[in-house]
Amino acid sequence: MATDMSQGELIHPKALPLIVGAQLIHADKLGEKAEDTTMPIRRAVNSTRETPPKSKLAEGEEEKPEPDGSSEESISTVEEQENETPPATSSEAEQPKGEPESGEKEENNNKSAEEPKKDEKDQSKEKEKKVKKTIPAWATLSASQLARAQRQTPMASSPRPKMDAILTEAIKACFQKTGASVVAIRKYIIHKYPSLGLERRGYLLKQALKRELNRGVIRQVKGKGASGSFVVVQKSKPPQKSKNRKKGSALDPEPQVKLEDVLPLAFTRLCEPKEASYSLIRKYVSQYYPKLRVDIRPQLLKNALQRAVERGQLEQITGKGASGTFQLKKSGEKPLLGGSLMEYAILSAIAAMNEPKTCSTTALKKYVLENHPGANSNYQMHLLKKTLQKCEKNGWLEQISGKGFSGTFQLSFPYYPSPGVLFPKKESGGSDDEDEDDDDDESSEDSEDEEPPPKRSLQKKTPAKSQGKTASMKQRGSKPARKVPAAQRGKVRPLPKKAPPKAKTPARKARPSPSVIKKPSGSSSRKPIASARKEAKLPGKGKSAMKKSFKTKK
C-alpha cells in the first residue's frame, strides 16, 4: 500500500479515481465473494472510461484464480500502469479534437474579417459607379474654374450612338450608284467605331441589317441576307405631314419647362439670408450695369452701400465702411432696398452672388406649385422628387440634412443669373419706363423739330395776311362803290363815264408798268381769287394813270 501511495503521488491527478477503484477490486479478490456488496460501490466510483480494463481483469481472474502476494503486487502495478495509459490516451484524444475546433475558429475569424473588407469594396465600387459627376449647363464658371472642375470631377464619356444609327450613317457615307456594299459598311464602322469590336462580333452588323430591313429604313438592292448592297429609304411625304400635324398639335399647348432648368433659379430666389461681399457686388454691377461706370467711379457704389446701411436697408455683417459683407433686409417678402438704378443694381447683385445657395424641400414644393403647377399637382411633386434624385446622382446638388424627399439641398456649382432672369417683371417694368422716357424724349425732340416749321408757315402766311388786308381794303373800296348812296351817284358817275373810253389806251400802257406787275409777283397768282382781285385793281390804277397823263398834257 505504501508503494501504491508513493506511486499515487507521482501519478497525474486525473488518474487518482482509477487507482482507488483498482485497490477496491484487489480487496474484493482477497475476501470471500464480496462482489455482490461492492459492485454498486464500484459502479458509483468508476467512470465510463474504466469499463474496458474491468473486462480484462475479469479474464485474468479466470485464468489465474489463486495468485500469490508477489503476484498481487505485480498485478496491482500492472493495473496501475494500465490505468495510467487511458488518461494519456484520453488527453491525446482531447487534443486532436480541440485542434480542429481552434482551426475552425481561426477560419471563421478570417472569414468574418474578410467579409467587411468585401462589403467595403462593394460599397466603394457602388459609389464609384453612382458618382459620375458632370458639369451642368447652368453653371457659371470661368475658364480656370471650368478646367479645375473638369480635373476634379471625372466627366462621363459621351455615349456612342446605337448600332442602328451607326448602320444608317455608314450606308450614307459609303453610298455609290449601286448602293453601299456590306464590305464597305463593315470597314467604315471598324475604322470609326473601334470600341464596338466588329472584327470579333460580326453578328452585330447582321442583326442591325435584319432589323432595319424589317422596319423599312433600308432597302437591299443586290444580294441576299447579310451580303450585297443596301440603300437608305427616303422618307415619303405623307408621314412628314402626319409628323407636322403631330408637332402642330403638340405645339398648341404651352411647352412645359423642365424642372432641372428651374431648380437653380428657385434656389437663388428662395435662399435666405442673402449676402455678398463688396468685391462680388462690384463685379456684378460692372458686368450687367455698364452705364453706372463702377470701374471708373467706385466711390458711387461705396457711397450707395453706406447710405443703404444707414437707412437700414442693408446690414453690414463684416468689415467697416464700404468693405466687408452686406446682407439684405426684408419687410415680409419684399426687400427694403430699391428705388434708384444704383440701389436696384445692388439688390440684384446681392441676390445673384449669394453663396452657397441652399433651400428646403418645403419651400421648393411651394415654389413649384405656384410658378409651375402643371396639370396634376401630385404628378408634379413626383417629378420634383425624381429630378432632385437625378441631380444628386449627377453631382449637381448635395443633400445637407434629412433623407429622401425631405431636408435641405445645396447647389454644388456656382450660379449667377442676370438681372433679366432673376427679376423679369422688374426688368420689363424698367424697360417700359425707359421706353416711356425715350418716347417722351422723342416727342420733345419732335416738338422741338416741329417748332421751326410753324415759324416758316408764319413767314409764308405774312404775305397772305398782307394780301388779305389789301384784298379786304380793295373789297371795302369796291363795296362802297357798289353801295354808293343815291345822293353821291351823280358825283361818281361822271368819272366812270370818262374813264371807259380813255381807260382803254392807258390800260394797255399801264399793264407793262413794273410797279403794277411787281406787286402781285410776291403773292400767289395761281389762285382765282387773287386774279379776280387784280382785275378789280386795274380800273382804279387806270384812273390814276389817266389823271397823271392829263396833268402832263396840260
From Swiss-Prot:
<feature type="modified residue" description="Phosphoserine">
    <location>
        <position position="144"/>
    </location>
</feature>
<feature type="region of interest" description="Disordered">
    <location>
        <begin position="420"/>
        <end position="554"/>
    </location>
</feature>
<dbReference type="GO" id="GO:0031491">
    <property type="term" value="F:nucleosome binding"/>
</dbReference>
<protein>
    <recommendedName>
        <fullName>Heterochromatin protein 1-binding protein 3</fullName>
    </recommendedName>
</protein>
<feature type="compositionally biased region" description="Polar residues">
    <location>
        <begin position="464"/>
        <end position="475"/>
    </location>
</feature>
<dbReference type="Pfam" id="PF00538">
    <property type="entry name" value="Linker_histone"/>
</dbReference>
<feature type="modified residue" description="Phosphothreonine">
    <location>
        <position position="51"/>
    </location>
</feature>
<feature type="compositionally biased region" description="Basic residues">
    <location>
        <begin position="238"/>
        <end position="248"/>
    </location>
</feature>
<dbReference type="GO" id="GO:0006355">
    <property type="term" value="P:regulation of DNA-templated transcription"/>
</dbReference>
<feature type="modified residue" description="Phosphoserine">
    <location>
        <position position="443"/>
    </location>
</feature>
<dbReference type="GO" id="GO:0070828">
    <property type="term" value="P:heterochromatin organization"/>
</dbReference>
<dbReference type="GO" id="GO:0006334">
    <property type="term" value="P:nucleosome assembly"/>
</dbReference>
<keyword id="KW-0832">Ubl conjugation</keyword>
<feature type="modified residue" description="N6-acetyllysine">
    <location>
        <position position="192"/>
    </location>
</feature>
<keyword id="KW-0238">DNA-binding</keyword>
<keyword id="KW-0677">Repeat</keyword>
<dbReference type="InterPro" id="IPR036388">
    <property type="entry name" value="WH-like_DNA-bd_sf"/>
</dbReference>
<feature type="compositionally biased region" description="Polar residues">
    <location>
        <begin position="72"/>
        <end position="93"/>
    </location>
</feature>
<feature type="modified residue" description="Phosphoserine">
    <location>
        <position position="444"/>
    </location>
</feature>
<feature type="compositionally biased region" description="Polar residues">
    <location>
        <begin position="142"/>
        <end position="156"/>
    </location>
</feature>
<comment type="function">
    <text>Component of heterochromatin that maintains heterochromatin integrity during G1/S progression and regulates the duration of G1 phase to critically influence cell proliferative capacity. May play a role in hypoxia-induced oncogenesis.</text>
</comment>
<feature type="modified residue" description="Phosphoserine">
    <location>
        <position position="249"/>
    </location>
</feature>
<feature type="cross-link" description="Glycyl lysine isopeptide (Lys-Gly) (interchain with G-Cter in SUMO2)">
    <location>
        <position position="64"/>
    </location>
</feature>
<feature type="domain" description="H15 1">
    <location>
        <begin position="159"/>
        <end position="234"/>
    </location>
</feature>
<keyword id="KW-0539">Nucleus</keyword>
<dbReference type="InterPro" id="IPR005819">
    <property type="entry name" value="H1/H5"/>
</dbReference>
<feature type="compositionally biased region" description="Basic and acidic residues">
    <location>
        <begin position="94"/>
        <end position="129"/>
    </location>
</feature>
<feature type="region of interest" description="Disordered">
    <location>
        <begin position="142"/>
        <end position="161"/>
    </location>
</feature>
<dbReference type="InterPro" id="IPR005818">
    <property type="entry name" value="Histone_H1/H5_H15"/>
</dbReference>
<feature type="short sequence motif" description="PxVxL motif">
    <location>
        <begin position="255"/>
        <end position="259"/>
    </location>
</feature>
<dbReference type="GO" id="GO:0042127">
    <property type="term" value="P:regulation of cell population proliferation"/>
</dbReference>
<feature type="modified residue" description="N-acetylalanine">
    <location>
        <position position="2"/>
    </location>
</feature>
<dbReference type="InterPro" id="IPR036390">
    <property type="entry name" value="WH_DNA-bd_sf"/>
</dbReference>
<dbReference type="GO" id="GO:0005634">
    <property type="term" value="C:nucleus"/>
</dbReference>
<feature type="modified residue" description="Phosphothreonine">
    <location>
        <position position="85"/>
    </location>
</feature>
<feature type="region of interest" description="Disordered">
    <location>
        <begin position="229"/>
        <end position="254"/>
    </location>
</feature>
<feature type="compositionally biased region" description="Basic residues">
    <location>
        <begin position="490"/>
        <end position="511"/>
    </location>
</feature>
<feature type="cross-link" description="Glycyl lysine isopeptide (Lys-Gly) (interchain with G-Cter in SUMO2)">
    <location>
        <position position="258"/>
    </location>
</feature>
<dbReference type="GO" id="GO:0000786">
    <property type="term" value="C:nucleosome"/>
</dbReference>
<keyword id="KW-1017">Isopeptide bond</keyword>
<feature type="modified residue" description="Phosphoserine">
    <location>
        <position position="447"/>
    </location>
</feature>
<dbReference type="GO" id="GO:0005694">
    <property type="term" value="C:chromosome"/>
</dbReference>
